[in-house]
């Protein structure tokens, strides 16, 4: 995983954007997930807690108005592009990017051809916000993975830890249009 870094002290990241100097006051170690834009310039960082910190993720933008899409600098837009929520999940799929959250609008506004995009949201059928975003994404006629009922794990990372063949599950459960709507109705729990 050559896309990840480690820092001993979270307060070191303030040098990337002085706006955060008053909000980051702790000194704990963090896993650093860097975000680069399409021009391969650093656009932000997500720092993940390693010891069960109350604030699990701290995201820092270099420029306030720049979108953070992990992996956008490495993706081949002429092939299927898998769009997941978290940077760590994206490391388990070839040609994937991460939204740094659940908003799909970032990717909808990107330069990736619509037919090449496959949204792979977390498996949280009881999360109303997520369910609404999955519904909106289906209504916008994108390819969406609808997890089968047999999958109980929340995200790709958990599935990999459970020895689930994630690529096979995604391949067999990617839907669009009316079929996606039908599978979505079966999947959601709110």
What are these regions (language model features)?
Residues 2-116, 130:
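Phosphate-handling DNA/RNA-contact segment within nucleic-acid enzymes
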